[in-house]
Amino acid sequence: MRYITAGESHGPQLTVILEGVPAGLTLTAEHINKELLRRQKGHGRGRRMQIETDTVEIVSGVRHGMTLGSPITLIVKNDDFKHWTKVMGAEPISEKESKEMKRTITKPRPGHADLNGAIKYGHRDIRNVLERSSARETTVRVAAGAVAKQILKELGVEIAGHVLEIGGVEAKHISNLSIEEIQTITENSPVRCLDKTVEQEMMDAIDNAKSSGDSIGGIVEVIAEGMPIGVGSYVHYDRKLDAKLAGAIMSINAFKGAEIGVGFEAARQPGSKVHDEILWDEEQGYTRKTNNAGGLEGGMTTGMPIVVRGVMKPIPTLYKPLASVDIDTKEAFQASIERSDSCAVPAAGVVAESVVAWELAHALVEQFGKDRMELIQQNITQHNKYAKEF
């Protein structure tokens, strides 16, 4: 499976085309809209989320609530486009139009794609860069993730995400929660945190950053249960599932780090405390005593829960802008200010769920049959029986 997205932040719409989704998957706009709504929530979101409704329109690949096996096209309209019709229109603008009408930007913002993108593509108007590099694009990545989650659900895999840290405020580790319990708790938390004792402290940190014109980042974790043993491959570097998951996390706007299982903590522990001992019994088959590997060894699943974390840096659009240089005059200026969030970590957690879900669903479809859901389900059932008796 693969997908491609298109659209600008203040353009008429965002589009995603999904290829390789099996036939026979139950899919409705309601499934996708539920995930889009989750992305819009979270303490610290900016005014843009008060403008956009973010509802999907399925325009191909689905008939009467069932996927056809052909490419699926999803679009999400940008409600804010009505205020940007002239600025973001596709037709040429006359020479008489002023810079103000075009809303031309010549001052790149530190921490963004602005300067590097302008140099790469030769744009003298940095708006041409920021409109596409904006995290607004993750709207349709969440839509794609919603389709992947539906695949996982029908294949017996559950997934959930939560926030571990915001602005230096750390949540306590809470173990032995089911995926359903994690989902319930986080959906009722304004910061998607499992630890209620630090919830208010996280919100205070966000509010303090906002009042001072600053921004803060954090850490999110995604957990998936129900993956069969042996999904992925050790044979080639580009087939290793952990590599794909790390790449997916790092592809999210403003994410600067990824780890699986105990991650970087493994560097501080001896091997005897890191590696997960193998157990077997007639009821479960092969299991592990611990899950320090985060459900992945040698680029393949172990049958234990997949545990992936991502680090999001503070959003670089600040209301007390950093120093920059005008690309036209080369004079020092304060960077341009675009409407932004003070903290998007809770929403980014939803995006992280989506990209992890896509990679897991892709791996299952690739390994167990690409054409139709019924065949994939049969093959996974047969594989699980084989793995248990191996």
UniProtKB/Swiss-Prot annotation:
SUPFAM superfamilies xref list: Chorismate synthase, AroC
Keyword Flavoprotein: yes
InterPro entries, A to Z: Chorismate_synth, Chorismate_synth_AroC_sf, Chorismate_synthase_CS
Family annotation (PANTHER family): CHORISMATE SYNTHASE
GO cellular component entries: cytosol
List of residues binding NADP(+): R39, R45
Statement: the UniProt record of this protein carries the keyword Amino-acid biosynthesis: yes
Record EC number: 4.2.3.5
Cofactor note: Reduced FMN (FMNH(2)).
Name of the featured protein: Chorismate synthase 2
A GO MF term: chorismate synthase activity
Family: Belongs to the chorismate synthase family.
UniProt keyword list: Amino-acid biosynthesis, Aromatic amino acid biosynthesis, FAD, Flavoprotein, FMN, Lyase, NADP
Binding of FMN, residues: R132, S133, S134, N253, A254, G298, K313, P314, I315, P316, T317, R339
Function: This reaction introduces a second double bond into the aromatic ring system.
Pathways per UniProt: Metabolic intermediate biosynthesis; chorismate biosynthesis; chorismate from D-erythrose 4-phosphate and phosphoenolpyruvate: step 7/7
GO terms classed as biological process: amino acid biosynthetic process; aromatic amino acid family biosynthetic process; chorismate biosynthetic process
Cofactors, names only: FMNH2
Annotated catalysed reactions: 5-O-(1-carboxyvinyl)-3-phosphoshikimate = chorismate + phosphate
Subunit description: Homotetramer.
